[in-house]
Amino acid sequence: MERLDKILSNFGGISRTEAKLALKAGRVKVDGTVVKDPAFKAEDNDEVSLDGKVLVRQKYRYFLLNKPAGYISSTEPEPGDTSPNVISLFKNEGVKGLFPVGRLDKDTTGLLIVTNDGELGHRLTAPGKHVDKTYIAKVRGELNESAIEAFAEGFEFKEFTSAPAKLEILEVQQQAAITAPEAADQEPMPPAQVSFTMAKVTIHEGKFHQVKRMFQKVGCEVVELKRISMGALNLDETLKPGEYRELKPEELKNIML
């Protein structure tokens, strides 16, 4: 059993003072009955709700987010960057201490684990862990067999040497280049074509801008980047950008291994 005001503070995302005010206002129910006493002891199997939402009384929560573009996932944003943080997407969960496991660049989308379990976060991001991360990239330029070989050999950067990575070319696209308007007396020219390549890449580290820098090494610029897997965990493609769900028990078990 646990005091009701403590339950609200631990699992409702509010302070003990706010919990007492919520109780006084009749906003809290236990098994469907309004309870106003902060000292009321709720059983472990009692259903406690705040403003009609049932509280999930778990110490740790684990979420799978399809990160949208434009959101930062760093716990220490760049000075002057007012972009929203991914944690703001979880404001209705009432969970304290949430943080993203690792980070994705602001313009990178896809799989991101969000939790309040610091031990798990450390295990997945520890330097010696080397959890595989797979991305779908759209790059400006064409990739070939030599690029695949270069990724497989690894790249030398100023601060680290990347481990061998797997690059798979999925598709080459031709798109019309955006050019300046032609003068009225100028004969129309056929539109120039620009090559883009869709590729899948799996890396073992997670350094700053690593995937983008690796493609720069082979003369290509990343224009879109989406993470689709991290270790044994795959992005749930039914989630729209900005949507999330709790990890399933088997998913949590797999990433704990």
Sequence positions of predicted segments:
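Basic, flexible Lys/Arg- and Gly-enriched helix-loop patches that mediate nucleic-acid binding at interfaces
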Residues: 1-257
